[in-house]
């Protein structure tokens, strides 16, 4: 059971009720609401030095704060830290919140953090005044170290913490990232109003990194190609830009599961690009494809992680929300339930969302069946489905852009920090 984070105490709404009677100028009141709704906005590229490190300095002096820099790297050489020249450093936290944990890749990174804190683990520290090393007995046999991730209910986090005797902590990094990256798009004229859209396609499905740990995207593309759904808005590279491997080589590890996958991909003319787009550019930190999205019944989100026991949603899930669209998520089991825990709504009253509770071995096939059942509908029927989804789409848009989601994340972040040992 996922703990509920659907907090119904939007601080913005409370402030509106308290202060509005005392505001005389309507224009001033509109501006005030605008400013208040952005008071908590975290600049995600400054979250370590402007949010976490000042909090630890003020509330948990003696902690070292580690993270990976620059964004997107997770190798041992990317580990950096903040520390104190005045306080006795007796504990530390490693904020590993940007990327999912892959045990076959990232154990060396975690070992690097242990090495950098060898003095704390041995109960020995350098007296910076005298220059002498001193041994400090640790109260109650306390073992130092926290691992802060953006993976909820994660078997990999449990393994790493058990292996290194770390304590786990969690917050939704990618929720904050999406709020920062997609802020302001509600004040543009790039996104066609929901009520004015004419639906001509079943889905939009951007694909960029498709090999290595992302091969579930190849599985999804396999079903799209095999089931004749290429007429939708789809992109697919001929070479994975991250792994630098051709798609035809990347599908070979999947032959045992899909014996005809090579021939299915060989029949496609790759790469498949969106109009006016080449080389499948990275669009993580901004919205795009506005025209294609406005024509599509739903956005097919192929998340970063789609297997294993964990909840790990990224900014990809929030693209359709910020674009004002319904969505289907190719993610881990329970991804929709996890998202609903943050106050968003999904589309179980519009189409079958039982795929969310399906096991890893069949979830992508269930999603493909859902997409095919929608794809065979008439254009008129797809428009009716989109119109039925409008209430949920508008709720999600408002929750994302009008402070509700941010308020939930802020409470979650502060509650998490309060649980860190002194």
Residue ranges and their predicted role:
Residues 5, 37-38:
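Basic polycationic patches enriched in arginine
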Residues 12, 23-25:
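Short hydrophobic alpha-helical segments enriched in small aliphatic residues
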Residues 15-18, 40:
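Leucine-biased recognition of intrinsically disordered, low-complexity hydrophobic segments
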Residues 40-287, 292-301, 307-314, 318-422:
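Pol beta-like nucleotidyltransferase catalytic core
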């Amino acid at each position: 059971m996922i703990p509920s984070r659907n907090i119904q105490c939007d601080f913005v709404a409370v402030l509106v009720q308290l202060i509005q009677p005392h505001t005389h100028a309507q224009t001033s009141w509109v501006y005030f609401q605008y400013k208040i709704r952005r008071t908590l906005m975290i600049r995600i590229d400054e979250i370590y030095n402007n949010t976490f490190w000042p909090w630890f300095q003020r509330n948990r002096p003696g902690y070292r704060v580690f993270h990976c820099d620059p964004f997107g790297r997770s190798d041992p050489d990317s580990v950096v830290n903040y520390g104190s020249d005045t306080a006795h450093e007796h504990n530390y936290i490693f904020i590993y919140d940007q990327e999912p944990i892959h045990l076959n890749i990232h154990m060396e990174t975690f070992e690097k953090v242990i090495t950098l804190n060898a003095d704390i683990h041995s109960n020995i520290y350098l007296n910076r005044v005298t220059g002498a090393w001193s041994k400090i007995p640790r109260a109650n046999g306390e073992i130092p170290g926290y691992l802060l991730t953006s993976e909820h209910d994660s078997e990999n986090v449990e393994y790493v913490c058990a292996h290194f005797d770390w304590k786990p902590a969690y917050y939704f990094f990618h929720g904050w990232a999406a709020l920062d990256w997609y802020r302001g798009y509600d004040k543009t004229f790039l996104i066609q109003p929901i009520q004015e859209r004419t639906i001509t396609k079943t889905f939009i499905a951007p694909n960029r990194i498709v090999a290595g740990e992302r091969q579930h995207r190849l599985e999804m593309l396999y079903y799209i190609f095999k089931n004749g759904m290429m007429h939708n808005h789809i992109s697919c590279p001929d070479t994975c830009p991250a792994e630098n491997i051709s798609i035809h080589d990347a599908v070979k590890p999947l032959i045992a599961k899909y014996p005809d996958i090579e021939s299915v991909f060989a029949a496609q003319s790759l790469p498949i690009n969106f109009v006016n787009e080449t080389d499948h550019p990275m669009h993580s930190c901004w919205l795009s494809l506005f025209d294609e999205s406005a024509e599509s019944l739903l956005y097919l989100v192929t998340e970063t992680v789609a297997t294993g026991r964990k909840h790990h949603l990224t900014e990809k899930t929030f693209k359709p929300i910020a674009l004002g669209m319904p969505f289907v998520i190719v993610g881990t089991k329970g991804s929709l339930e996890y998202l609903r825990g943050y106050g968003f709504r999904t589309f179980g009253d519009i189409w079958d969302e039982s795929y969310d509770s399906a096991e890893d071995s069949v979830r992508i096939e269930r999603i493909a069946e859902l997409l095919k059942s929608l794809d065979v509908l008439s254009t008129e029927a797809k428009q009716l489905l989109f119109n039925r989804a409008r209430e949920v789409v508008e709720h999600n848009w408002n929750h994302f852009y009008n402070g509700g989601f941010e308020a939930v994340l802020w409470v979650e972040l502060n509650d998490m920090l309060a649980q860190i040992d002194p």
